[in-house]
A protein has these predicted regions:
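Canonical Rossmann dinucleotide-binding motif of NAD(H)/NADP(H)-dependent dehydrogenases/reductases
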Residues: 1-12
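Active-site-adjacent segment of SDR/Rossmann-fold oxidoreductases
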Residues: 126, 147-158
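SDR active-site lid
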Residues: 154-218
Length: 244
């Protein structure tokens, strides 16, 4: 997604865990003519998030785009996963994202027509096996950012919630199992998902067009509409679908 925004005149601040991967992405953005700065921080640690946002506020007067793409998934039954695992998922997927947003709101308000992009999931629209805490964290994102959108429309801040289905990324490799460890397995559904560059282009398009919500993926997106308009069909399919 960073590469879709990499162009002359843009200064990208790339932030996540893994300095080497961040720097590699930043260098790829620079080759496309963009300024790019790589900053490592940990969304699961509030003090790390605060240090990151303080660094941004000291060096910049405004933020034109804030795009949340970080997150961690889950592959465990609710009864098997301890509450500590649920808390960790919520800390990364929900509290980390909203802390960054709250801290940077003054810089977003200082911009002209600032835009926020939030990566949720189709699991933010319906529950699904092995994803109880993950789905809860995504449901929470919808509640927060839909409220934020209404609170700041007079500040010309648009909020786009992006709900991907199966995208060919390594997210399932790091999904937490019942022991709170990365499962280390690429799900077949993930491996056969849409290409990540296609997903990134659709995300950027939705953000720049001020779409409020967008669903990205393959035929699994139909489940969103089945849940809304034909609930019995949704539940019939969900019970029979392989959760991986």
């Amino acid at each position: 997604l960073a590469l879709t925004y990499a162009q002359p005149g843009n200064h990208l601040l790339l932030a996540a865990l893994g300095q080497e991967a961040l720097e590699n992405t930043a260098e790829a953005c620079r080759k496309k003519g963009s300024e790019a700065t790589a900053i490592e921080f940990d969304l699961s640690k509030p003090e790390s998030v605060k240090a990151f946002t303080n660094q941004i506020k000291k060096k910049h007067q405004k933020v034109d785009r804030l795009v949340h793409v970080s997150g961690i998934s889950q592959r465990a039954r609710a009864e098997e996963a301890s509450i500590d695992i649920d808390r960790k998922i919520m800390e990364i997927n929900y509290f980390g994202a909203i802390q960054v947003t709250k801290d940077l709101l003054p810089l977003l308000k200082a911009a002209t027509n600032a835009k926020i992009g939030v990566t949720s999931s189709i699991s933010g629209k319906f529950g699904f096996p092995l994803r109880s805490a993950y789905a809860a964290s995504k449901f929470a994102l919808h509640g927060f950012f839909e409220s934020l959108r209404l609170e700041h429309y007079k500040d010309n801040i648009s909020v786009t919630i992006m709900c991907p289905g199966r995208v060919n990324t390594p997210i399932s490799l790091s999904a937490l199992n019942a022991q709170g460890k990365a499962q280390g397995v690429m799900d077949p559904g993930q491996a056969n998902g849409i290409p990540v560059d296609k997903c990134a282009r659709q995300m950027k398009r939705a953000i720049e067009k001020n779409k409020k919500e967008v669903f990205i993926g393959g035929k699994e997106i139909l489940m969103v509409y089945f849940k809304k308009f034909i609930p019995p069909l949704f539940y019939r399919i969900a019970k029979k679908t392989n959760p991986t």
